[in-house]
């Protein structure tokens, strides 16, 4: 567009919607600012009835302004005189036009895609600074949300809010992501990892052609995010939250953190939704979405969480105390439904006396977790108080084992001690508690609606917005109609629910629920045997007349079967007991495999404690054996330590050149 008077190409837009020449001030004809899209200028039928002006421009009666009546008359007259004089001197030559200089960041080719007006070209430093800052900010926000949830939902001490700040900031500072050569080193490492080692042609896509890339053509932003996720994985947020709880002395276990994260009670899997509201989906220098950058896809195990907590503590130089034995042991005793007064006091005495190093967090993932040591101390205390030493208390409660004449006195003394602490009642309660804990399920797995809600809100959160079609909209419609149309009650997912309210004395293999025909893994011989027994004892009268010893024998066989499932061997009760001291078990090798042998009363105690501690029964047994060996070592050496005499030596600092042995004798 060129001015008809002075042939200038620079114009100014005024408030009335018209354009005026910057040099002569003449209004441009046939051009007005409408403030609407070009498509709005065409109305129905192809006419221009649909054209609308900008609302700020009033529709007034136009008054034509001719070039003979310019807007700036003084400037126009001076310019006319200057033009006529210049043309007369130069022979009617054209006036020199203004040369508009492009800025330094001018691109030779015009952009093919719309960009922001007055947008500055992003530098290499802008890209990696923005990518790093957004990831670190999202990481710290996730830790903050988790600590807030621990305090609000689980009544954890608010002290963790003050502890988690220094821990997380020191972890970020020592991770090396803010090193001055961090971005260049990441690009260089990615180039060294190329498969063929040859220089490839960097193919820049039109969509991301302005972004920096490595020599192989990979986007630098994706390379930096890959390094950030390896250096500071999102799972470290759970580790730091647990580390703050451990440092504050809260009785929070790694199993609790993992369980709460999987249930969605602790912000982790869907925490990126809250982070996106605070930070936005993306920025100009960081085109990676928050739903990709700050979204974890799995929850680490409790074993790995505890080991990584110790690694982070060593990295930042944080000295860790032992676990809160009193708080964790109290929670375990409540879950076991055992009287707390005597057991907890004895367990604390044993812990203070032995001071096991297993109560400290370890960097070794193959080592038994600290909660196993806590439960091992409780098992030893329960065995000492209730005299659970393979004396056949559980078998005698079934009336199956008869005491011989030779050991009648021993059994009578044992019975008196067992009656004092009610060992038989304890074993029955522990057995019922085991089946109760085994049948427990997560709140999200109790029914189908809860399970689907967990999947929608946690595991598949945010997929509705990213879906390019109406797939998830259809799912929402089906989801809204499900609770109304579903009238069938969803039974909870339970294991061995028939054992919950049935005591072991009343179990019978003759019941159809217990037949081996329901077990797909049973052999044909066992199935035929159970069927034959069921046919022989099909009548209810015959079942009632069956001997109690037969039923109790079946109960013992069932316990032996359960022990075999856990790779344990059943040991009959001890007879002719000569010493009523604490019984220690050992593992023996047979054909290259370790044999775990135990009595029935000890196994009943062991398996329920392992179930509460969420650990395998054999690993729980290993922890108990390790702690018992430590106690035996202390008892063996304590007499020697008490009778040690100081060596004869001279110390000028503490004895004033005196003889230590002589001072002791005096």
From Swiss-Prot:
Binding site for Zn(2+): 3, 6, 21, 24
One Pfam family, short name: Rrn7_cyclin_N
Region (N-terminal cyclin fold): 81-285
Subcellular location as annotated: Nucleus, Nucleolus; Nucleus
Record region (C-terminal cyclin fold): 286-288
Start-end of RRN7-type zinc fingers: 1-29
Segments of this protein annotated with the region B-linker: 65-80
Keywords annotated in UniProt: DNA-binding, Metal-binding, Nucleus, Transcription, Transcription regulation, Zinc, Zinc-finger
Presence of keyword DNA-binding: yes
Composition skew (Polar residues), residue ranges: 78-89
Biased composition (Basic and acidic residues): 90-110, 189-202, 539-548
GO biological process: embryo development ending in seed dormancy; RNA polymerase I preinitiation complex assembly
Region (B-reader): 30-64
Gene Ontology terms: cellular component: RNA polymerase I core factor complex
GO-annotated molecular function: RNA polymerase I core promoter sequence-specific DNA binding; zinc ion binding
Predominant location category: nucleus
Subunit structure: Interacts with TFIIF. Interacts with MEE14/CBP1, TBP1 and NRPB1 (via CTD).
Free-text comment about domains: Although it shares weak sequence similarity with GTF2B/TFIIB, displays a similar subdomain organization as GTF2B/TFIIB, with a N-terminal zinc finger, a connecting region (composed of B-reader and B-linker regions), followed by 2 cyclin folds.
Protein family (similarity comment): Belongs to the RRN7/TAF1B family.
Primary role: Component of RNA polymerase I core factor complex that acts as a GTF2B/TFIIB-like factor and plays a key role in multiple steps during transcription initiation such as pre-initiation complex (PIC) assembly and postpolymerase recruitment events in polymerase I (Pol I) transcription. Binds rDNA promoters and plays a role in Pol I recruitment. Required for the development of the one-cell zygote and endosperm in embryos. Required for micropylar pollen tube guidance, but has no effect on ovule development and gametophytic cell fate specification.
Protein name: TATA box-binding protein-associated factor RNA polymerase I subunit B
The organism's taxonomic lineage, starting at the top: Eukaryota, Viridiplantae, Streptophyta, Embryophyta, Tracheophyta
Gene designation per UniProt: MEE12
């Amino acid at each position: 567009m060129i001015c008809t008077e002075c042939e200038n190409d620079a114009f100014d837009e005024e408030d009335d919607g018209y354009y005026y020449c910057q040099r002569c001030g003449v209004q441009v004809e046939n051009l007005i600012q409408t403030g609407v899209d070009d498509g709005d200028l065409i109305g129905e039928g192809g006419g221009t009835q649909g054209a609308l002006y900008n609302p700020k421009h009033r529709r007034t009666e136009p008054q034509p302004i001719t070039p003979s009546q310019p807007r700036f008359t003084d400037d126009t007259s001076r310019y006319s005189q200057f033009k006529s004089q210049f043309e007369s001197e130069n022979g009617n030559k054209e006036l020199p036009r203004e040369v508009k200089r492009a800025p330094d960041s001018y691109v030779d080719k015009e952009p093919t895609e719309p960009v922001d007006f007055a947008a500055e070209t992003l530098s290499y430093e802008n890209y990696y600074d923005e990518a790093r800052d957004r990831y670190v900010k999202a990481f710290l926000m996730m830790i903050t949300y988790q600590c807030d949830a621990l305090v609000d939902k689980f009544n954890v001490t608010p002290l963790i809010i003050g502890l988690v700040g220094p821990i997380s900031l020191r972890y970020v500072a020592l991770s090396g992501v803010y090193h001055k050569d961090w971005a260049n080193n990441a690009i260089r490492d990615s180039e060294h990892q190329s498969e063929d080692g040859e220089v490839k042609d960097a193919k820049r896509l039109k969509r991301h052609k302005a972004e920096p890339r490595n020599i192989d053509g990979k986007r630098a932003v994706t390379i930096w995010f890959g390094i950030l996720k390896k250096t500071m994985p999102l799972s470290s947020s759970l580790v730091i939250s647990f580390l703050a709880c451990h440092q504050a002395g809260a009785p929070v276990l790694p199993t609790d953190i993992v369980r709460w994260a999987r249930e969605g009670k602790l912000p982790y899997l869907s925490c990126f939704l809250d982070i996106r509201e605070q930070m936005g989906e993306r920025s100009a220098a960081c085109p990676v979405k928050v739903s990709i950058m700050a979204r974890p896809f799995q929850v680490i195990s409790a074993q790995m969480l505890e080991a990584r907590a110790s690694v982070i503590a060593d990295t930042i130089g944080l000295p860790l105390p032992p676990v809160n034995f009193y708080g964790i042991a109290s929670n375990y005793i409540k879950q076991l439904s055992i009287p707390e007064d005597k057991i907890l006091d004895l367990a604390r005495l044993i812990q203070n006396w032995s001071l096991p190093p297993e109560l400290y967090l370890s960097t070794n993932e193959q080592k038994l977790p600290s909660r196993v040591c806590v439960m091992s101390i409780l098992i030893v205390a329960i065995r000492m108080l209730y005299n659970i030493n393979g004396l056949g208390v559980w078998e005698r409660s079934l009336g199956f084992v008869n005491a011989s004449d030779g050991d009648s006195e021993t059994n009578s003394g044992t019975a008196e001690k067992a009656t004092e602490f009610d060992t038989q009642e304890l074993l029955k309660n522990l057995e019922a508690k085991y089946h109760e804990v085994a049948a427990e399920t997560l709140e999200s797995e109790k029914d189908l609606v809860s399970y689907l809600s967990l999947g929608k809100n946690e595991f598949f959160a945010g997929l509705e917005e990213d879906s390019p079609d109406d797939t998830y909209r259809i799912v929402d419609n089906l989801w809204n109609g499900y609770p109304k149309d579903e009238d069938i009650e969803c039974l909870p997912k339970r294991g061995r629910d028939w054992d919950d309210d049935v005591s072991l004395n009343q179990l019978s293999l003759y019941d159809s629920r217990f037949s081996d025909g329901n077990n797909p893994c049973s052999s044909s011989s066992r199935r035929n045997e159970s069927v034959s027994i069921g046919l022989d004892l099909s009548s209810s009268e015959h079942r009632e007349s069956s001997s109690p010893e037969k039923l109790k024998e079946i109960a013992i066989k069932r316990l032996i079967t359960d022990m075999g499932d856990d790779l344990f061997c059943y040991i009959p009760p001890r007879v002719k007991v000569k010493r009523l001291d604490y019984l220690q078990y050992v593992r023996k090798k047979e054909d290259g495999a370790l044999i775990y042998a135990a009595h029935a009363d000890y196994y009943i105690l062991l398996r329920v404690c392992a179930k509460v501690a969420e650990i395998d029964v054999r690993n729980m047994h290993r922890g108990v054996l390790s702690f018992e060996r430590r106690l035996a070592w202390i008892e063996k050496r304590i007499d020697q330590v008490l009778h040690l005499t100081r060596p004869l030596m001279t110390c000028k600092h503490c004895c004033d050149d005196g003889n230590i042995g002589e001072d002791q004798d005096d």
